[in-house]
A protein has these predicted regions:
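A charged, aromatic-enriched C-terminal amphipathic alpha-helix characteristic of glycosyltransferases
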Residues: 233-267
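Acidic, glycine-centered active-site loop in nucleotide-sugar glycosyltransferases
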Residues: 205-216, 228
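Conserved acidic donor-binding segment of nucleotide-sugar-dependent glycosyltransferases
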Residues: 214-223, 231-236
Length: 283
């Protein structure tokens, strides 16, 4: 495993000069799309290549600056396999002819742990709101905060993040317009929060094994969010039971060790189309 800085990601052919690529049976890249999207000519020279993609929801998110960019990029890479973290996103890529496979986002079970402390924050959200991609998230959360005691927070260390999740009773997830569930949903569930999440639809919940009223609560808009919140307050015992089942579910479905097996299964399938052009052709 190798970790690449931004400059190395921006010029992969230079980075790979000293790597005996023929000694590897598989190549898996988990890099920033904005750094690799102009390097399709070089990427086509890497044999048995799999790209791990977490941001392809931006390809069809309303108002996204990257609209259509992911499909255009992957169409330039015939024979390349893509692991996508969204079920609907994976179907979107497949419809465009991309060899895409669904493996959801997850969390480190050794870090995201249940702590024995009081949950003194009734409603909480931890995360960014400044990006244009999160404008709908910001609108929903700020609107909710005007009528409910929602705490919108940022944390600065990994330990602080876990400790704060363990203080939240109900985690308000607002993945509005993203078409998939971000990792923070599963991290919150792993830390014992009751997850109140925006329904993504298009088979996303079924693919993840998420069941409304069983291991999380789902809402469709602000009105239904407020209704589900009121239900949770009126039925604290049932709400706690859902939180417990949610934690059990993500530990079995979204922990890194479980996802590693899924990724291994995807990349172990033989590649039928491998590069036949040497890297030096593209200098």
């Amino acid at each position: 495993m190798r970790f690449l800085g931004k400059d190395q990601q921006r010029c992969l052919r230079r980075y790979f000069v000293d790597i005996a690529i023929d000694k590897y049976e598989r190549v898996i890249l988990d890099l920033m799309f904005k750094h690799v999207r102009t390097q399709s000519r070089f990427l086509r020279t890497l044999p048995a290549l799999t790209l791990y993609e977490e941001d392809a929801y931006l390809d069809f998110m309303p108002g996204s600056r990257w609209s259509g960019a992911f499909v255009r990029f992957y169409r330039q890479l015939p024979g390349v396999r893509v692991i996508s973290t969204g079920f609907a996103v994976t179907n979107h890529l497949r419809a465009a002819g991309v060899d895409a496979h669904f493996v959801p986002k997850g969390f480190d079970p050794a870090r995201m742990v249940l702590q024995n402390q009081k949950r003194d924050i009734e409603l909480g959200f931890i995360g960014r709101l400044g990006s244009a991609a999160y404008s709908a998230r910001r609108t929903l959360l700020e609107t909710l905060a005007k009528v409910e005691p929602l705490e919108i927070m940022r944390t600065h260390t990994a330990n602080e993040y876990v400790e704060t999740l363990n203080r939240i009773n109900i985690f308000i997830s607002a993945d509005v317009g993203l078409s998939e569930y971000m990792a923070k949903n599963f991290e919150a569930m792993a830390c014992g929060c009751l997850l109140l999440a925006k329904r993504q639809g298009r088979g996303e919940e079924e693919a993840l094994g998420l069941e409304d009223g069983v291991n999380l609560l789902l809402y469709d808009d602000l009105a239904s969010l407020l209704e589900r919140l009121e239900w949770a307050r009126e039925h604290p015992g049932l709400a706690q039971s859902i939180a417990v089942k949610g934690r059990e579910h993500v530990l079995a479905r979204n922990a890194y060790d479980k996802l590693a097996r899924e990724i291994s299964d995807v990349v172990s399938v033989p590649f039928t189309n491998v590069s036949s052009q040497p890297w030096w052709k593209f200098w």
